[in-house]
Amino acid sequence: MARTPRIKSSGEGTAYYHLISRCSNRQFLFRKAASKDRLMDLAKRAAEFSGIKLLALTVMDNHFHILCSVTQSSEAVSREEIIRRVGVLKGDAAAQELRERWDNFAAAGFTAMLEAELCRYRARMNDISAFMKTMKELF
């Protein structure tokens, strides 16, 4: 049975969410403390990248709960802020690689390509679905 789609707030302001995710096939992936610690670290990094504030995080043996707040804003996330967030999520080398890529786009006059990539990153900001996807992909 498919899960019920998330009901997400639309518009500016702060919204609060209780997110739950279970392991597939009734596996107990988080039984070991190291796995729980790894998931908690990934959640913190993914939240920083996504612009989401973690309020509480509980990791059980086969599922986890996240309580978070998301503040929507009409202001777009700047290019430098996106690069900083990529560094938090994937490390300084990935952030530097992205900076060089975008600098090369700008130097070559490929502004449409640069803007398209910026739009893809901005679409992932302040979005709980993108946050959960990012976190699970990194685990």
Regions found by a protein language model. Give the residues of each.
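Short catalytic/metal-binding and nucleic-acid-binding patches
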Residues: 1-139
